[in-house]
Amino acid sequence: VIEEDGYTTILSSKDLCMIDHLKELVDAGVDSLKIEGRMKSSYYVAVVTRAYRKALDALKTGDERWKMFRQDLFDISHREYSTGFFFGHGPVDPTMGQGIDKSTEQGYLRDYLFCGFIGEQVEPGVFALELKNQIRTGMTIEYIASDVYRIEDDAFCLLDENFQSIDQADHGKMQYLKTDKAIEKGYIIRRETVVK
């Protein structure tokens, strides 16, 4: 916390994460949440929004499946998490790292790489690709969507603009993905950062 010339600035080397404390926030009268998305990718905003939406819905329904979406918060690119000053200076949850008053141990953490989006279906099981990062045949990719947790696919085929088989697809080219998985336009494609 920096105080100078009549203003106060709060700077943190950590990302605020309050998903485990939504009940306390709602009980305190909070009826709107702001996801910090400035300078973040559409993938980041989609995953974070989905996790918080599922957690808020679970407050009403008691559905415990929201916890699997919570895990995605640890898979996206993020700094060490903290609950900020909501509960004082110390850590409330050991999965959130040190308290806000301790310097962060690591830079950005990321278990998954955002690869792009599924585009228009051009024929049954064949979709245009809107890629941001490379994918290759033989690797395992995942599809996620607002109500779809994860669909793994390691048997997809990649096609060039002439529908000829290729080994890899890259950003900025007209390419297609052929799969037997039940996916749709708009699904997000991602892969683990350490390719197995």
What annotation goes with each model-predicted range?
Residues 1-196:
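Surface-exposed amphipathic alpha-helical tracts and adjacent flexible/coil segments at the periphery
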